[in-house]
Structure formats: structure tokens, C-alpha cells
UniProtKB/Swiss-Prot annotation:
EC number: 2.3.2.27
Zinc-finger ranges (RING-type): 102-144
Organism (species): Arabidopsis thaliana (Mouse-ear cress)
Protein name (Swiss-Prot/TrEMBL): Probable E3 ubiquitin-protein ligase ATL44
Top-level lineage group: Eukaryota
Tissue expression notes: Expressed in stems, flowers and green siliques.
Region feature Disordered, mapped onto this chain: 163-185
Segments passing through the bilayer: 29-49
Keyword Transferase: yes
Pathway(s) per entry: Protein modification; protein ubiquitination
Free-text note on domains in this protein's UniProt record: The RING-type zinc finger domain mediates binding to an E2 ubiquitin-conjugating enzyme.
Encoding gene, per UniProt annotation: ATL44
Main location: membrane
Amino acid sequence: MTRPSRLLETAAPPPQPSEEMIAAESDMVVILSALLCALICVAGLAAVVRCAWLRRFTAGGDSPSPNKGLKKKALQSLPRSTFTAAESTSGAAAEEGDSTECAICLTDFADGEEIRVLPLCGHSFHVECIDKWLVSRSSCPSCRRILTPVRCDRCGHASTAEMKDQAHRHQHHQHSSTTIPTFLP
């Protein structure tokens, strides 16, 4: 019996990757990179939307209250007066120049007409004109000054519109040691 001889061959070199495989692998890297970037963008957008949504509902303390109209009782409590041309041409009224005209209907006041002079700013209007305005808004049509007192959200203290600025809020709440920043969600 003869033994078959087996020739030992050297191991063949590993096959070289084809150009098609290299192109497919680089395409896969590009696709995965694009998907990762898209995922990061969606996560960032979701975080911004969530922050804006939460801030909208939690920052109510610092945002100004909506300019709602005055109630009937407050409207009736505003002083009425009768216009006279002799009074309007003297003193500070003559310096302003606009106290003889209603800024809403743009007509001059006539002698004996009933007018309202707003207490905080001193602007004058026909009673009918300003009453229609103040039913839907609580500010002066000329200077936009709020006519109703603003209540503090923390303690309920009523203040005039001039005191609503940031400095007053800090002075009013000096006793409060904890301040919650509104920029945090």
C-alpha cells in the first residue's frame, strides 16, 4: 500500500477586499453619521420646545397681566367733568396743547361737553369715547399707562402702575430670602 502523498502548499494570501465592498462600507459610515446627526438635532429641538413650553406656563409671575377692561364699578368711579374753554387755555393745559381734543375720536371739546380726565396721567377724553375704550382695555389710549392697581403675586399688595418696575419688586420683597429664577424650567 502506498500512501498517497500530500503536498504541503503554502497558505494562499487572504483575498483582497474588492472595491465594491470598500464602497459599501464607506456608504454605511456616511448613512450612520447622517442618522446620528439627525437624532442629535431632533433631541435638541425637543429640549428647546419643552423648555419653551414649560417657561410659558411657569413664568406667569414676571409677565405683565393681560390688559383687560375695567369693571363697571371702576369705570363709574372715574371722575367726570364739564369742559370749559376758559379753563383749557390757562396753565399746564395750554402747554400740552392736546387737552382740547379727544385722542380717540379726534374732535375738539365743545363748551359744556362731559369729559373724563384720567387720574394717573391727566389725559382728557369724551365720556362716551373713553368708556367704550376702557370696557375692553384698562390703559390710557394716549400714553398706555395702566389705570388699575397691579397686585403682587406673592403677597397680594396693590401698587400703582408706576411701581410695577423691577426695582420696586426687589424693594417690596426684601424680606424674602429665597428668589426663584424664572429662566429655569
